[in-house]
Every structure is written in structure tokens, then in C-alpha cells.
A protein has these predicted regions:
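Divalent metal-coordination and catalytic microenvironments
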Residues: 24, 52, 82, 131, ...
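Active-site beta->alpha loop and helix N-cap motifs at the rims of alpha/beta catalytic domains
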Residues: 28-35
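His/Asp/Glu-enriched, well-ordered alpha-helical/loop segment
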Residues: 102-130, 195-198, 202-204, 209-277
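Alpha-helix-loop-beta-strand connector modules within alpha/beta enzyme cores
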Residues: 6-26, 70-81, 230-236
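Histidine/acidic residue-rich metal-binding segments in metalloenzymes
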Residues: 11, 38-204
Length: 326
């Protein structure tokens, strides 16, 4: 079982080396098959990963998470957690807020997120493990992480672009608006913005989760969870936060690029992208390079267009109108 984990990681790393045009840094699974039943071979995977995560599943067992943190601490790697208490989900699929109540939808309570964060922070106190929380969406989560940082715990966190610019008042009866964690209330969105401004939230990550058009065409209840974000993150955040003066451009770049490299010990290198900040356009999923095109931002007027991407000093992408520059 453990041998297969290390072999699979080796296959993944070879595929990255052979096919990726940008740098890709994998995580190792905390538990075998991300099933939450037995710890993975963390020691065997450690040389090839930047941390350990069960991706979109929360580790339900307190003891398993404690042991994972102790072993990750010894290896000098962070635990990267999707926080979710399964027993509190109760079949929900959007935030348990006003929209869910008004339209008869089953809701996901905020405690399903912050309850597991609270448990994990207690385990961080006990183990001294470096700990990173993925896609924070609830105001209570922000408050817990702020308190943990004030106590000196080695904790970082991220949120997603969609949680900063939308809330459950923006929901439509459309699978494009379904993601996990869900879009929460206005107070949650405001707490997240405060969190990026005061340094409680260290990063903004796209949480890019592409699905086919068919998988996202079944309405809020039956569509797959997930939102695409790689191609919309910067223009949406630049338009909604930087242009109105809520956030500086330098701060946005720290949140999107710099802080994650610092946290995970990644080299800065000669990787960068070139943007036309004055380019104004409507987001059209037909223009996406991603095969996943279900975005709640379709039709949104934004500013900021990627002109080119350079990795290791090499041009790996040029916008169609600049294609001849290749």
C-alpha cells in the first residue's frame, strides 16, 4: 500500500516534468486514498511534496490528525487542511442562510468549517506543527485564525476570489454558483475582506475545480461542487478590490503570488506574467483555455488582461492578439 503511494507520486512528478509548462508542486495525501482511515506514508513522500493534504476532505479523526501533525512536524512539512465536519453537513449544498431558507434548499452551516478549524488549532498547540487552512469562507473561521496567530501558532490560511466579491445574496438557481465551501453571507464576506487587509488571511487561492458543462448543468442541488478560477482570479480581484481602492495592487500580488512561495519554501525564480491593466472586457467562458468553463462571473465587466506568461525565463503563453511575439 505504502509502496504504491510513493510510486504514484513518482509517476505524477514525471508527468509534471514532461508535460507542464509552468512549475507544479504536489501535496502528499494525509490519509491513504484520502479516505480518512489510515495515515499515508508521509516519510516516503516527503522528499517530493511541499506539504500534506487530503484535498477536498476533512480528516474526521482527532487521533489521526494529531499523529499526522506530529509526523509532518518531524519532517518539516505543513499540514494543509480542507476543514469540514461531515456530521454537520446533513446533505446541504449551499450556505445555510437567507437564500437557502427562502428557496427551500438544504444549507451547509458555517460550523461545519470553523468547528474543525477550532479542533485543528488545538492540535497545533499540542504538536507545534505548521498548519495551513484552505479556502476559508466563514467569519468565525477568520476570528479563530486571528486569535491563533496572536498566540504565536504557526498558522496560515487562504480564501478564494469568489468569497471576497460574492455572497449568498448573489446566488442563482444555477450550478455555476455551487462550490465547497459555499458562498456565505454578507457578514462573512466583509470579515474575509477585513482578514486580507489586517494580515489574518495570508493568501488568495483560486480553488480551481473544473467540471464538464453537463456536471454543472443540474441546478444547485444536483450539480457537482466546484468553480473554475485560474483565468478570472486576477481580473475579478483587480476590478472589485484594487480599482475601488479597497486593496493596493502590491498587496494583491502578495496575496496571489508572494506569500504562498514564502509559506511553502518555493523559489521566486524568473516566473512572471505581463498584464494590460487598462484592457476592459466582459468575461466570456468561451475564451477560457481551461476545459472547465462554468463560472458565476460569465458576462462580468472587468479590467486586466494577461498578455504573456514567462516561466524560467521562457515565454510559455502569449495572448492571441500577441501570438506573433512568440
Amino acid at each position: 500500500m505504502y509502496k504504491r503511494q510513493v510510486e504514484n507520486l513518482g509517476i505524477q512528478r514525471r508527468l509534471i516534468e514532461e508535460t507542464a509548462c509552468i512549475h507544479v508542486y504536489p501535496y502528499g495525501a494525509i490519509t491513504v486514498g484520502e479516505q480518512g482511515e489510515a495515515l499515508s506514508d508521509l516519510e516516503g513522500m516527503a522528499p517530493g511534496v511541499v506539504g500534506f493534504s487530503d484535498d477536498g476532505r476533512g480528516v474526521q479523526s482527532d487521533d489521526l490528525m494529531r499523529q499526522a501533525m506530529l509526523r509532518a512536524k518531524a519532517l518539516g512539512k505543513p499540514i494543509v487542511a480542507h476543514c469540514e465536519v461531515n456530521s454537520l453537513l446533513r446533505g446541504g449544498y449551499i450556505h445555510d442562510g437567507d437564500y437557502a431558507k427562502a428557496h427551500g434548499h438544504r444549507g451547509i452551516c458555517s460550523e461545519s468549517e470553523w468547528g474543525q478549524i477550532a479542533r485543528d488549532l488545538q492540535l497545533v498547540k499540542e504538536t507545534g506543527c505548521a498548519y495551513h487552512v484552505c479556502h476559508v469562507s466563514a467569519k468565525e473561521s477568520v476570528a479563530l485564525i486571528r486569535k491563533a496567530k496572536a498566540e504565536g501558532l504557526d498558522v496560515t490560511c487562504e480564501t478564494g476570489p469568489h468569497y471576497l466579491v460574492m455572497d449568498d445574496s448573489d446566488l442563482q438557481e444555477d450550478g455555476r454558483f455551487k462550490m465547497n465551501p459555499p458562498l456565505r453571507g454578507k457578514e462573512d464576506r466583509e470579515a474575509l475582506i477585513h482578514g486580507i487587509l489586517d494580515g489574518t488571511i495570508d493568501m488568495i487561492a483560486t480553488d480551481h475545480a473544473p467540471h464538464s458543462a453537463e456536471e454543472k448543468s443540474r441546478g444547485l442541488e444536483k450539480s457537482a461542487f466546484g468553480i473554475v478560477g485560474i483565468e478570472t482570479a486576477f481580473p475579478i480581484l483587480y476590478t472589485c478590490l484594487v480599482k475601488p481602492g479597497i486593496l493596493s495592487l502590491n498587496k494583491l500580488l502578495e496575496l496571489l503570488c508572494v506569500n504562498s512561495r514564502r509559506r511553502f519554501g518555493l523559489p521566486l525564480g524568473t516566473d512572471y506574467s505581463i498584464w494590460d491593466l487598462n484592457a476592459a472586457y466582459a468575461i466570456d467562458p468561451k475564451d477560457f483555455l481551461s476545459k472547465g468553463r462554468a463560472t458565476p462571473f460569465a458576462g462580468r465587466q472587468v479590467s486586466g488582461k494577461c498578455i504573456a506568461t514567462i516561466c524560467d525565463g521562457k515565454l510559455v503563453y502569449a495572448a492571441p492578439e500577441t501570438h506573433t511575439a512568440k
